[in-house]
Amino acid sequence: GYGHYGHRLVFDDEGYLWITSGDRQKFTPAQDMQSNLGKVLRLNDDGSVPSDNPFVDHFADSPLVDRIGVYGEVWSLGHRNPLGIAQDSQGSLWVIEMGPRHGDELNLIRKGGNYGYPEVSDGDHYDRRPIPDHITRPDFEAPKISWVPAISPSHLSFVEGTQFEAWRGNALAAGLGAKVI
């Protein structure tokens, strides 16, 4: 597929490397546990997989893949095109991603969480075919915020410091389509 690379990087306060990965404009990878596309990944700073990642069950000779071929670096799945990743002052990890037609999302990332794409979205396919909303499938993690119309997010950060005290702790999202922060 073309596009939807995602691939944003951030180190958290504990030194773990977090990587977002887009679905490459294909529908199956985001739910395929034998692919690291459409996922949020977590690695140690040396590139190894943390032993407490949710899907770790490694073979010694293949440290990234377990007995049934699941990638151990996967932290969460069901992402379409995550283009911003940031840690808040409480240590929680957040991802902002472009949905399909409308349905851009701000997600609080949970260990082993499945965010549902392409099974659910608060947007529709570009050819206007509907995608079931998150509310129809409570087994998937719903976004904390979704945007209709889309904002086409490109970055996410949390305000720190004292220069903008009134905004301290708030998230700022850059919107390509909306041309706003």
Each predicted region: which residue ranges?
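Asp-box/WD-like beta-propeller blade repeats and closely related beta-sheet repeat scaffolds
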Residues: 1-10
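Beta-propeller domain segments
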Residues: 4, 23-181
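Alpha/beta-hydrolase-fold catalytic nucleophile elbow
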Residues: 12, 20, 96
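S-adenosyl-L-methionine-dependent methyltransferase catalytic core, i.e., the SAM/SAH-binding region
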Residues: 17
